[in-house]
Amino acid sequence: MAEAKEENREKNEEEESVKLFVGQIPKHMSESQLLTLFQEFAVVDEVNIIKDKITRASRGCCFLLCPSREEADKLVNACHNKKTLPGANSLLQVKYADGELERLEHKLFVGMLPKNVSEAEVQSLFSKYGTIKDLQILRGAQQTSKGCAFLKYETKEQAVSAMESINGKHKMEGSTVPLVVKWADTERERHTRRLQKAQSHIARLGNGDPTNPSLFGALPMGYVPPYNGYGYHQPPGTYGYMLPPIQNQAAFSNMIAQPNQGNNNALQGTSPDSVPPRLARRNFPMPPGNYMGSGYPAMRGHPFPFAYPRGIVSPRPLSSSPGSISPGMSTPLGIGLSSVVQTEGPEGANLFIYNIPREFGDQELAAAFQSFGIVLSAKVFVDKATGVSKCFGFVSYDSQAAAQNAIDMMNGRHLGGKKLKVQLKRDSNNGQPSSNPSLIS
């Protein structure tokens, strides 16, 4: 009898444990009480009550750990929507925890497949290690292989055997690199990776402009506010905005009290024509600061050294449109400052993107697609009346290969919680790729 129990225990340990989520449990019940109760229906190894992070009180739900899928199914069938625990008002909700069913499917990802490989060839290779329940080669919009596939085995042991035998060791005919075989990501892992990718895009946006030290226009590190009693100083009546040309401008400037009298070289009169071109085209969202003993060098021909030539909240000056790309990003992305003119790529290199996250603008759209090639332009369309995104737009590349690569990798992918639809831009008249598409208002 003891030997039989030991045999069963060893068998269970070899099988993979399964996590279940249970809702509608009384908040006063302890883990030991719940364990005893659920063990009446199936073998349960562990109970973990989900508690409030601050009060540490039960939230009325828990996780159960069963030694096998068979035991987990027994518990689900016996309790889900069928049992009510003492002190509870609703039926128990028992289901597999998030990601468990995917994990239990023994699903493998196979990468570095030759583009011309057939499903029969993949089936022939992997069927040596067990029974394949499902096999799918991923294909793009033109039904061309993406060089990867998903397959499912009947048992975990078969999947492990295939991984150990093929991953990094086997090269298929026509390929110079070995296959990559690993466990397929669960939905939770895919969601985490999407978040990390979105964060990296945001980080690149923040570092794209050399004059913008941070994404939100924060002042440079080491900046010390002017707490010396003098504070910021601006010419009366100007408040940091460019003045229209007036007669005797130099005399007007000389009437203004000049700070830092000890530094006469920095106290020259100014006019709009004397401001450097980089600054002359900007209207500042707030007064450019100046304070006594500024750590910033004075501008030639300007009496007030600028602490930071941009807005504190927005990294763009007011003269730029909300949808335009910042100057520092124009070089790596190849995108001009104007958000009105849509730069068109060659035929077959212009994409239509649908289901763009509502919070995305031109700049974010360009950043999301820049890893596939040189982006000539990116445009998100907005409602003229409300300024709210219509959730579709266009991206133009410098080559057809870059556009096709973007379609293969981004079509059907989730971005910001929305599933993208990416395809070649087409002429609405004849359904053919358009070389001069009309902009949709």
From Swiss-Prot:
Enumerate the spans annotated as RRM domain.
18-99, 106-186, 349-427
Annotated region (Disordered), positions in chain: 258-282
Quote any Pfam family the record assigns. Answer: RRM_1
- GO cellular component annotations of the record: cytoplasm; cytosol; ribonucleoprotein complex
- Tell whether Transit peptide is among the UniProt keywords: no
Instruction: State where it is primarily located.
Output: cytoplasm
Example GO biological process = regulation of photoperiodism, flowering
Role: RNA-binding protein involved in the regulation of flowering time. Acts as a repressor of the activity of SOC1, a transcriptional activator of flowering time. Binds to the 3'-UTR of SOC1 mRNA in the cytoplasm and participates in SOC1 mRNA decay, mediated by the distal region of the SOC1 3'-UTR. Acts as a positive regulator of salicylic acid (SA)-mediated immunity. May act on SA signaling-related genes at a post-transcriptional level.
The protein depicted here goes by the name: RNA-binding protein BRN1
